[in-house]
């Protein structure tokens, strides 16, 4: 049994779990167990399938005829699709284990229906990655969008429904762009099979039009700026294990689509240099603005969602370097760029999945998303705190964890641009490096804020004081992802050549010899630190703060006196502790043009409180893009809809007239 057949069994299990959940409506507890266990087994089979495929290193193709010539079912598993399915399967296994007990809070609230849409969502993502026909690709893409949309609106409250509608609009706008791109290629090739697209040699203008349509269409799904507005609204609205899958792997379908079109389907045409520069520019902007908006958030899941925009930007930055390398026929740039992109794609799926599961554990105990109402959870939820600490260190790209490794390779790809003689790239490279450096510093600040406000200090609410650790299956799921973050970092010298082999196979570039270790000199892979020495350094570095603390403690006087913290003559209250808003305030001032700040005035003055109630702080910071672009578009659409509504008179005869008029217009258009 080959890898494609194994994957078919995995898909069958997902579909079985989906349909079984549908038939178990009203039996939520049984539906949760059946759905979770079946999808877990499907994920394990998917992992085995893709490891087998990547080890074999061959491309598998299966073709099934249908009654429609344009919709023949063709499956193709190459190195990139196998890698992507492996990433999805890893996260599916962990999220399925997590959902066994997490979904109990949704009993009686449509848990069986959520199981149906969750497994349909997973199946559509996996099948889409191996689909080699444009018609079925779009069908599965729509199925993925619709099933995830139902997960977003699962709570059926006003916030989730509004988030779902915005997601629905942007997702389908992206689908239309992708559809037009495929139809343009289909018109030139006479077929909707991707195999025929690969043989096309399009004119530069048409190729650029196809690329731009596909780039912004898939970019909407990836959550890149300026098509990101749905992401910080939709991901927090979904159940936490669904948020982990949406943020960890669904947005990567957008990255996969960009790679597929630009570096596979249009490879025969050739890539203009400006394509790669455009992708780099949007990636750098997404990374920097994404982390800035993450810093401004109080909602823990919105913070993580904005961080996804940042990490998608980092991945696109590396993808842009790979595209530049392909356009310049530079194997080193191409392969190192793809190495950084794919490595970070894998790492982000792991640590972002971990953090969303951790956020779900906290919310299930405290029943709030507001970090200002948390605090001191490290004492009450120690396992969750430990797992989230590893996730925060990893996403901050601090050694010795996996985020550091993949961002290091992204840095290497940017350093390698110095070898290129093109003036535009010699300017773009340093600018991108500066933006990535600022992004990295802000990311550390962001997750210090998140961990400190959430897990440290004093409890800021009754729920925080009474919080308890989550059930064992949720803990094990989080610890598995935390262990993978550490394991991948320690095995980077073994894993990097495997990912480079995927890059070679996907781009059909000559092999680039890279010895074990991590390059330290820009543009070359000859001067290195040995893996054993690097591992020793990475393991020793985190111990230095602890050793310094022990040294300082030994120098303190033996006699100590403890008392309340000084609070300017007032009695100490937990609300006086540093807040997330206080951490962000300097950046809000420096980058005030990027935020819309609101100040609410309270006309009531209380003599005993002085001026304490004159002003109330804004509970949220709204990005300028939402205020100046998205909101006007939504308002204009609503006004247009009200005008069109006048056509809905309720007169059946008038409706028949509309049909006849539309038919006449179409006949005239065809005749002309």
Language-model regions: role of each:
Residues 60-69, 195-199, 332, 409-423, ...:
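Membrane-interfacial helical/loop segments at transmembrane boundaries in membrane proteins
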Residues 74-89, 204-218, 349, 424-440, ...:
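Hydrophobic alpha-helical transmembrane segments
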Residues 495-539, 550-672:
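Aromatic-capped, Gly/Pro-kinked transmembrane alpha-helices
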Residues 9-27, 219, 223, 287:
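N-terminal signal-anchor/start-transfer transmembrane helix
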Residues 37-51, 172-180, 388-400, 477-500, ...:
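Hydrophobic alpha-helical membrane-insertion segments
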Residues 94-137, 147-469:
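Hydrophobic transmembrane alpha-helices and their helix-loop junctions in integral membrane proteins
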Residues 2-8, 19-116, 188-201, 501, ...:
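Transmembrane helix-loop-helix hairpins at membrane boundaries of multipass inner-membrane proteins
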């Amino acid at each position: 049994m080959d890898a494609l057949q194994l994957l078919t069994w995995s898909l069958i299990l997902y579909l079985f779990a989906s349909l079984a959940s549908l038939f178990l409506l009203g039996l939520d507890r049984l539906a949760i167990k059946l759905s979770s266990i079946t999808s877990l087994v499907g994920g394990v089979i998917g992992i085995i399938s893709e490891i087998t495929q990547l080890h074999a290193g061959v491309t598998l193709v299966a073709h099934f005829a249908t009654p429609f010539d344009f919709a023949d079912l063709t499956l193709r598993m190459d190195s990139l699709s196998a890698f992507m399915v492996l990433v999805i399967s890893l996260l599916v296994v962990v999220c399925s284990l997590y959902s066994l007990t997490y979904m109990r809070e949704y009993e009686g609230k449509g848990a069986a229906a959520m199981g149906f849409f969750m497994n349909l969502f997973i199946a559509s993502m996996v099948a889409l990655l191996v689909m080699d026909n444009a018609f079925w690709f779009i069908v599965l893409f729509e199925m993925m969008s619709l099933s995830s949309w139902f997960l977003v609106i699962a709570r059926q409250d006003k916030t989730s429904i509004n988030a779902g509608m915005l997601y629905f609009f942007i997702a389908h706008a992206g689908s239309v762009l992708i559809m037009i791109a495929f139809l343009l290629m289909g018109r030139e090739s006479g077929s909707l099979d991707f195999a025929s697209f690969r043989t096309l040699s399009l004119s530069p203008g048409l190729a650029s039009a196809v690329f731009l349509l596909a780039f912004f269409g898939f970019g909407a799904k990836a959550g890149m700026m300026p098509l990101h507005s749905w992401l910080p609204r939709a991901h927090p609205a979904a159940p936490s294990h669904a948020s982990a899958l949406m943020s960890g792997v669904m947005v990567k379908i957008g990255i996969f689509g960009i790679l597929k079109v630009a570096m596979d389907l249009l490879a025969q045409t050739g890539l203009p240099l400006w394509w790669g520069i455009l992708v780099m520019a949007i990636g750098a902007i997404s990374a920097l603005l994404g982390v800035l908006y993450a810093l401004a958030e109080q909602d823990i899941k919105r913070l993580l969602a904005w961080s996804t925009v940042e990490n998608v930007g980092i991945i696109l930055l590396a993808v842009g370097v790979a595209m530049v390398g392909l356009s310049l026929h530079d194997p080193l740039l191409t392969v190192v760029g793809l190495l950084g992109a794919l490595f970070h794609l894998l790492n982000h799926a792991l640590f972002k999945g971990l953090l969303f599961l951790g956020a779900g554990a906290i919310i299930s105990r405290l029943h709030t998303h507001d970090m200002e109402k948390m605090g001191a959870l490290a004492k009450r939820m120690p396992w969750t705190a430990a797992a989230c600490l590893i996730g925060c260190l990893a996403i901050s790209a601090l050694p010795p964890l996996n985020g550091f490794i993949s961002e290091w390779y992204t840095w290497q790809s940017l350093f390698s641009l110095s070898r290129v003689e093109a003036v535009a790239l010699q300017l773009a490279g340093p600018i991108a490096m500066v933006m990535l450096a600022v992004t990295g510093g802000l990311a550390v600040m962001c997750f210090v804020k998140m961990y400190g406000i959430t897990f440290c200090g004093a409890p800021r609410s009754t729920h925080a004081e009474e919080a308890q650790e989550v059930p064992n299956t949720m803990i094990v799921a989080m610890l598995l992802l935390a262990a993978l973050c550490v394991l991948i970092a320690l095995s980077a010298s073994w894993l990097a050549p495997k990912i480079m082999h995927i890059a070679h196979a996907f781009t059909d570039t000559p092999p680039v010899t890279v010895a074990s270790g991590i390059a330290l000199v820009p543009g070359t892979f000859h001067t290195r630190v040995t893996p054993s020495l690097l591992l020793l350094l990475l393991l020793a570095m985190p111990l230095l703060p602890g050793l310094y603390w022990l040294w300082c403690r030994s120098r303190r006087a033996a006699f100590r006196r403890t008392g309340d913290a000084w609070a300017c003559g007032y009695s100490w209250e937990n609300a006086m502790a540093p807040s997330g808003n206080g951490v962000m305030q300097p950046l809000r001032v420096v980058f005030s043009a990027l935020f819309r700040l609101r100040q609410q005035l309270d006309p009531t003055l209380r003599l005993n409180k002085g001026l304490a109630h004159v002003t109330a702080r804004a509970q949220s910071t709204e990005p300028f893009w939402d205020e100046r672009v998205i909101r006007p578009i939504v308002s204009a659409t609503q006004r247009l809809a009200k005008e069109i509504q006048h056509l809905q008179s309720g007169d059946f005869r008038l409706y028949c007239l509309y049909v006849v008029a539309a038919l006449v217009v179409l006949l005239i258009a065809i005749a002309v």
